[in-house]
């Protein structure tokens, strides 16, 4: 019934198996991939023809994690998987980025890649396996795809590169780098690092590229026996239209791109575009080309002219040379009632960034396949349409916003203080108010400034820069601090963030094959100089974290209590902790290890809560005298609350030096009394005495002390 084909190799010390022909046979391509004991299913379906009027390539990648893969049942009321998690969105982008440039220009058929994690061994991260399975499914599908693509994760542990480290090994690694590409070229890099130098980062990229070569061989081997017939796709030849357009409008378009101000330049380009449409799409008579074709070739022509200008003149759209960074203005304390704020402006890209400090209650609980964990650093990036002078949808963040926020998060996280050093939950929000390229790197710079303004002790300031590339044959130009147009019309988007001493985050997306190690080395070196310049400009606003928190930020005091005392502090059903919170006004968070965090904007509230908790957990000392309150009387004595929440019994024989017939003859409920702690009985119950203490002065009575000692 099944025409199954399997290829298996040993890769980085674990078996990698690719299987097709048994599952999801109605998809154009389907591969069940296993690495260790982690299993994913990747499927590809591409429409047989493009939709009428389609002028772009509609590629969708959906990565989904099923909780059954890790033997779990989803939380929530409905008990089933819902909207994609942040991690699912990020992995979807990770798969999308290296495969998108390998579809031929002009292919516009609706294409969907769906990757499902069906088993997780809690050792091997499914993201790399998902990239490989997607590439294999595309290679088998017959869809026009210039693959295959391979991918690998690289760690850096004890000064050595490690290929595909296990999940638990990543805790020891100073690098988490994912690289993807073909036999000859690197197409995508995503990484987080602990201040590593440029040569180590470049070495990791090349190590990963070499490391996934056996995977490409395995995909080709599977394709040789299981690939479908390639679809007949011939891109349209528009060389005649392009030649005509160049002949009539090249000079005008070149002049338009000499205008350095964005709005004026766009207006001039639009004017040329209107002339192009009037020329090739006349209102009377039959047009030789469609509006979509004319629009597409005009875009292509724009790219060519910008690229030629840069390579020929070494001058860019806005008049800068290749290495100059746009003018930078940094401000902090922009919003004084927030905990920390900054305005970072670089050319026509601008971000308002606000930092907020919270307590342990504000940590984000993340339910992943590997288990529940808490995240104390949150970074949210918002890109409203007005930032580019447009109208558009407002609402929940899209994939791009989630991805850009995570890139900035990776850049900043290595410089954050530990929870022990700084026991706050941190949330940073970046509001992009203007954008003309590199808004994610503006977010990195603004976040660093806002956190320092908030008094968060960052190890070092962090800055980011976006690099671009123009490559034509043997000629290339690496561009520092790219504009939006240079991003769209160039061959590479290369974002580097870090401190003056090393890289903390690196992201690279390459739109063409053939980026060499030499070009990456030049780009990294040029980015280092640009990053140093930006850090210098940021230092004009603030050089290090403020010595104290902002006026409106909460204060947190940390104390430790014995684990066996946690129940007493919380109380039955939370009664005690609720009372402390209600009466002091402080927020209290108690960890399982006995760490107690008390938070409030008022020092008095913190101190009141601290003393209350201390009174509960502290142990009274035998022989000490305490002031207490009678809380209950009985025939055999009185119960006195004498130490925090601790009560003890004053036996009727210990109420007074003379014989007492009735407890209430000496004390009544609510009376203030002085008691001495005599000790504990065999059951741990407290034994108190009033008769050895002068009830007027609270001092011990010498004669009674001698009698007590003699009796003992």
Curated annotation (Swiss-Prot):
Which cofactor is essential here? Mg(2+)
Provide the primary localization.
cytoplasm
According to its UniProt entry, one GO biological process term is: mRNA catabolic process
Extract the signal peptide range.
none
Binding of Mg(2+), residues: 487, 493
Pfam (any one): S1
Which key words tag this protein in UniProt?
Answer: Cytoplasm, Magnesium, Metal-binding, Nucleotidyltransferase, RNA-binding, Transferase
> Which Gene3D superfamilies is this protein grouped with?
GHMP Kinase, N-terminal domain (3.30.230.70), K Homology domain, type 1 (3.30.1370.10), Nucleic acid-binding proteins (2.40.50.140)
* CDD domains cross-referenced by the UniProt entry: KH-I_PNPase, RNase_PH_PNPase_1, RNase_PH_PNPase_2, S1_PNPase
Q: Which reaction does it catalyse?
A: RNA(n+1) + phosphate = RNA(n) + a ribonucleoside 5'-diphosphate
Q: Does the keyword Nucleotidyltransferase apply?
A: yes
Domain S1 motif spans what residues?
A: 623-691
For this UniProt entry, the molecular function terms from Gene Ontology, in alphabetical order, are: 3'-5'-RNA exonuclease activity; magnesium ion binding; polyribonucleotide nucleotidyltransferase activity; RNA binding
Give residue ranges for domain KH: 554-613
Q: Provide the E.C. number(s) assigned to this enzyme.
A: 2.7.7.8
The answer to whether keyword Zinc applies is no
Provide GO CC annotations from the record.
cytosol
Broad enzyme group: transferase
Family per similarity comment:
Belongs to the polyribonucleotide nucleotidyltransferase family.
Q: Which NCBIfam families match?
A: polynuc_phos, PRK11824.1
Q: What does this protein do?
A: Involved in mRNA degradation. Catalyzes the phosphorolysis of single-stranded polyribonucleotides processively in the 3'- to 5'-direction.
From the Swiss-Prot or TrEMBL record, give the protein name. Polyribonucleotide nucleotidyltransferase
**UniProt organism field:** Rhizobium etli (strain ATCC 51251 / DSM 11541 / JCM 21823 / NBRC 15573 / CFN 42)
């Amino acid at each position: 019934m099944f025409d199954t084909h399997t290829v298996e190799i040993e890769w980085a010390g674990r078996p990698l198996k690719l299987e097709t022909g048994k599952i999801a046979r109605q998809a154009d391509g389907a591969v069940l991939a296993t690495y260790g004991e982690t299993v994913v299913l990747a499927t590809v379906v591409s429409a047989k023809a493009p939709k009428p009027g389609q002028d772009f390539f509609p590629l969708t990648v959906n990565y989904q994690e099923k909780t059954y893969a890790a033997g779990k049942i989803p939380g929530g009321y409905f008990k089933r998987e819902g909207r994609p998690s942040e991690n699912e969105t990020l992995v979807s982008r990770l798969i999308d980025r290296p495969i998108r440039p390998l579809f031929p220009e002009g292919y516009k058929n609706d294409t969907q890649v769906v990757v499902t994690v069906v088993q997780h061994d809690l050792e091997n991260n499914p993201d790399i396996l998902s990239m490989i399975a997607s590439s294999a499914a595309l290679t088998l599908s017959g869809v026009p795809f210039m693959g295959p693509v391979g991918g690998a994760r690289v760690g850096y542990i004890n000064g050595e590169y490690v290929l595909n480290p296990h999940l638990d090994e990543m805790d020891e690694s100073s690098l988490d780098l994912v690289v993807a590409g073909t036999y000859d070229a690197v197409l995508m890099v995503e990484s987080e690092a602990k201040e590593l130098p440029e040569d180590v980062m470049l070495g990791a990229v090349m190590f990963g590229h070499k490391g996934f070569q056996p995977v490409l061989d395995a995909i080709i081997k599977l394709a040789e026996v299981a690939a479908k017939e390639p679809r007949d796709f011939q891109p349209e030849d528009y060389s005649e239209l392009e030649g005509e357009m160049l002949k009539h409008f090249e000079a005008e378009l070149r002049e338009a791109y000499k205008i350095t101000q964005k709005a004026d330049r766009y207006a001039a380009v639009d004017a040329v575009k209107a002339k192009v449409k009037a020329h090739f799409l006349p209102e009377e008579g039959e047009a030789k080309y469609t509006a979509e074709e004319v629009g597409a070739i005009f875009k292509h022509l724009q790219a060519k002219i910008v690229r030629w200008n840069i390579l020929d003149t070494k001058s860019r759209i806005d008049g800068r040379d290749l290495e100059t960074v746009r003018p930078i203005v940094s401000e902090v304390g922009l919003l004084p009632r927030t905990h920390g704020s900054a305005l970072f402006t670089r050319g026509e890209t601008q971000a308002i960034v606000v930092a907020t400090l919270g307590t342990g209650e504000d940590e984000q609980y993340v339910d992943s396949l590997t288990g529940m964990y808490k995240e104390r650093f949150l970074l949210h990036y918002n890109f409203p349409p007005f930032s580019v002078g447009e109208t558009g949808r407002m609402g929940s963040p899209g994939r791009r916003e989630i991805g850009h926020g995570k890139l900035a998060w990776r850049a900043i996280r290595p410089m954050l203080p530990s929870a022990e050093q700084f026991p706050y939950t941190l949330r940073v929000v970046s509001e992009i108010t203007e954008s003309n390229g590199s808004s994610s790197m503006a977010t990195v710079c603004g976040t660093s400034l806002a956190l320092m303004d908030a008094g968060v002790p960052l190890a070092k300031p962090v800055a980011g820069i976006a690099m671009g590339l123009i490559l034509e044959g043997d000629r290339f130009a690496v561009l520092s601090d790219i504009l939006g147009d240079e991003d769209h019309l160039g061959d590479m988007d290369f974002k580097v963030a870090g401190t003056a001493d090393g890289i903390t985050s690196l992201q690279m997306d390459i739109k063409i094959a053939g980026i060499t190690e030499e070009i990456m080395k030049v780009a990294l070196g040029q980015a280092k100089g640009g990053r140093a310049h930006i850090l210098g400009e940021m230092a004009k606003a603030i050089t290090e974290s403020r010595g104290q928190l902002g006026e409106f930020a909460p204060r947190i005091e940390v104390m430790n209590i014995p684990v066996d005392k946690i129940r007493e502090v919380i109380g039955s059903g939370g009664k005690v902790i609720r009372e402390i919170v209600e009466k002091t006004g402080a927020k209290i968070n108690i960890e399982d290890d006995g760490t107690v965090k008390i938070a409030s904007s008022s020092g008095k509230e913190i101190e009141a809560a601290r003393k209350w908790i201390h009174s509960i957990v502290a142990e009274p000392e035998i022989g000490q005298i305490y002031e207490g309150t009678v809380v209950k009387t009985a025939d055999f004595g009185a119960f006195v609350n004498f130490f925090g929440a601790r009560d003890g019994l004053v036996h009727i024989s210990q109420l007074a030096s003379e014989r007492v017939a009735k407890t209430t003859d000496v004390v009544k409920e609510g009376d203030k009394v002085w008691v001495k702690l005599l000790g504990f009985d065999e059951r741990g119950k407290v034994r108190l005495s009033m008769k050895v203490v002068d009830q007027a002065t609270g001092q011990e009575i010498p004669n009674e002390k001698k009698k007590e000692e003699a009796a003992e």
